[in-house]
């Protein structure tokens, strides 16, 4: 009887212990000089898919750090279609106009279910008109992490595009040919996925540091020609505006911040992804320099404008879950106080601490806002999905002052309405609406209203803005929907705050 067998006899609770075999019995690759370093490398995406164990009915995930420049989602799903996969759940952190190619793979049954922060373009239009049998689950950035944490969403294989990685899987978005900057979305997928496949443009020597995605999270690595076009990150929702009306609204929003009571040394802010929201940053610079007020940090999607303020010493730290342009991506590589964070650290209501809980001021956009301050950023005036939840309801709930910026009208369609088509962020989370026709303050914040009026800002009742809008356009004709639910709007805690119904033909 050997020593291990004696242990089994004398200590029954140790029966699972095994006797020593060889030094490499548990790590056979260490006995192979090639496999020791290259065992994760795959010659093709197809090889990585086969090694991952992906099967019909499983869940695949992607990140959208390249936004409209992404080349991974369409490439991988097209391959899975050729390989014969069916009934998959697609869990991308968001979907863009560039993902219209998914329509054929939904129609053919390759993709049966979708979890996403949002969608745009022909894909969103097709789904809004009933393309899918199951409704799309639309979550916030923080809410996505909570769905993973709670076990409703389980990622079987994550396909994560990165500009560079070493042969063990240490990867970042700040080096290589196609720098996208922060990999805040991908960090969550790498943590929760059963298997992680990296698609990398460059294979660089070990150790590739700093590592946003770490070697102990990565299973397989495929070198590909391109994962994305970083030049297309700052288009669409993340574009920079020169529109005079949007700039005027941005200036008004900066005035609101200045006189809100929160504009003081050490304040914190997030400026969102909409054109007027991002433009607000440049007007804040002028006010900060004039008053000598410096911000402790800025959070969220980071823009070149925020980088400028950081490098001028006006913002101490940048906490970055997504870079909205090349300037931000370059800053992340060189500025030690420009720090990458995951969406879990950013805004997960189920995390042990979310950075958004430290926010003083946030500027957000809206497709619609109603007289009860409920906000819609998902469906357009035609009822078609054309936006994304993003971090909207996350930061709106957490910040001390939540400001929504929007024009009163868009193409003769009212933005201020009696009731939003789709409710994403509840009115209780919205404090101020800034439009080109005036500023409305939620009645729950009378102290803010008083401060703004004392400063001489044009404060009006939100009902007056609604009346002004319909006096210019008339009351919009109600949208015709069928009874079929095509989208489920999940609040950040996972609850259902609204649904989207199919648009009638």
Map each language-model feature to its residues:
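Conserved alpha/beta enzyme-core scaffold
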Residues: 1-505
């Amino acid at each position: 009887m050997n020593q291990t067998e004696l242990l089994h006899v004398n200590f029954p609770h140790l029966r699972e212990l095994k006797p020593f075999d060889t030094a490499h019995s548990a790590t056979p690759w260490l006995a192979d000089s090639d496999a020791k370093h290259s065992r994760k490398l795959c010659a093709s995406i197809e090889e990585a898919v086969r090694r991952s164990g992906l099967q019909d009915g499983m869940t695949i995930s992607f990140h959208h750090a390249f936004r409209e420049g992404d080349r991974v989602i369409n490439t991988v799903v097209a391959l899975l279609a050729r390989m014969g996969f069916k009934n998959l759940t697609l869990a991308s952190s968001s979907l863009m106009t560039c993902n219209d190619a998914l329509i054929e793979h939904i129609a053919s049954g390759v993709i049966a279910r979708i979890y996403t922060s949002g969608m745009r373009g022909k894909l969103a239009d097709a789904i809004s008109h009933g393309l899918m049998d199951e409704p799309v689950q639309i979550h916030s950035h923080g809410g996505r992490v909570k769905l993973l944490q709670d076990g409703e969403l389980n990622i079987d294989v994550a396909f994560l595009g990165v500009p560079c990685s070493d042969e063990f899987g240490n990867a970042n978005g700040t080096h290589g040919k196609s720098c996208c900057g922060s990999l805040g979305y991908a960090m969550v997928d790498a943590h929760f996925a059963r298997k992680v496949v990296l698609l990398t443009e460059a294979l660089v020597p070990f150790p590739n540091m700093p590592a946003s995605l770490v070697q102990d999270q990565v299973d397989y690595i495929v070198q590909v020609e391109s994962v994305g076009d970083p030049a297309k990150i700052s288009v669409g929702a993340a574009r920079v505006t020169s529109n005079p009306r949007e700039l005027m609204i941005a200036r008004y929003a900066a005035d609101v911040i200045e006189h809100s009571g929160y504009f003081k040394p050490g304040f914190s802010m997030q400026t969102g992804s909409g054109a007027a929201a991002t433009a607000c940053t440049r007007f804040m610079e002028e006010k900060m320099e004039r008053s000598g007020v410096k911000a402790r940090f800025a959070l969220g999607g980071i823009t070149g404008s925020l980088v400028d303020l950081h490098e001028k010493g006006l913002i101490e730290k940048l906490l970055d879950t997504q870079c909205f342009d090349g300037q931000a991506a370059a800053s992340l590589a060189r500025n030690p106080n420009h720090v990458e964070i995951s969406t879990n650290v950013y805004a997960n209501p189920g995390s042990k601490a979310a950075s958004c809980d430290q926010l003083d001021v946030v500027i957000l956009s809206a497709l619609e806002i109603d007289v009860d301050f409920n906000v819609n950023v998902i469906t357009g005036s035609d009822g078609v999905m054309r936006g994304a939840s993003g971090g909207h309801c996350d930061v709106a709930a957490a910040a001390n002052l939540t400001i929504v910026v929007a024009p009163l009208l868009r193409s003769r369609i009212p933005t201020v309405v009696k009731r939003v088509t789709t409710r994403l962020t509840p009115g209780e989370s919205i404090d101020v609406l800034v439009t080109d026709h005036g500023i409305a303050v939620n009645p729950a914040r009378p102290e803010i209203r008083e401060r703004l009026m004392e400063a001489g800002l044009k404060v009006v009742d939100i009902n007056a803005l609604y009346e002004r809008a319909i006096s210019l356009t008339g009351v919009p004709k109600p949208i015709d929907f069928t009874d079929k639910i095509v989208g489920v709007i999940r609040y950040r805690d996972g609850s259902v705050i609204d649904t989207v119904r199919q648009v009638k033909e």
